[in-house]
Amino acid sequence: MVARGRRLEPRTSKKRGTATGPSPVDRARNGSKQHLLVDATGIPLAWTVTGGNRNDVTQLVPLIERVPPVRGRPGRPRRRPERVTADRGYDSNALRDQLRERGIEPEIANRYLGHGSGLGRARWVVERTFAWLHHLKRLLVRYDRRHEIHEAFLAIGCCLVCFKRLQNSL
């Protein structure tokens, strides 16, 4: 702004209120992450909600332990998957070793290689399930202050996804 040949300096005011949190572009992320474990058709088997600043690697084994018994072939119901396909956030040699000890074949993208590893052909099932869940606006944007309430709504959303898949198969 120019007035009478002089440049006026804009007044600076305090831009942050008392309820303003840290910048969302910092590495210390606000918010939450939803972790899903789905079968080959996209039906959620286990889910959890963690803070946005937590590593994904720490959540895969507890997620696998939450899988309920799944009936399939004759015999005992399965309690663990044969194979786990995950994105780069779960890339860890220690995690791969833990999965192999449990008899699970890990297919985890390497974070240091470029895109195009071929895992996208299997990972789209998880992304489609997230898209189904995000039709529920309550899960797309987290309005709940308490972790338990948001996880309960995620559980309801997973139940609705299972119900719709069952309805479509009849």
Regions found by a protein language model. Give the residues of each.
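Polybasic low-complexity intrinsically disordered regions
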Residues: 1-111, 153, 157
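Basic, amphipathic alpha-helical segments enriched in Lys/Arg and hydrophobic/aromatic residues
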Residues: 97, 101-103, 118, 122-170
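Short gly/pro/ser/thr-enriched loop/turn and capping motifs at secondary-structure boundaries
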Residues: 113-116
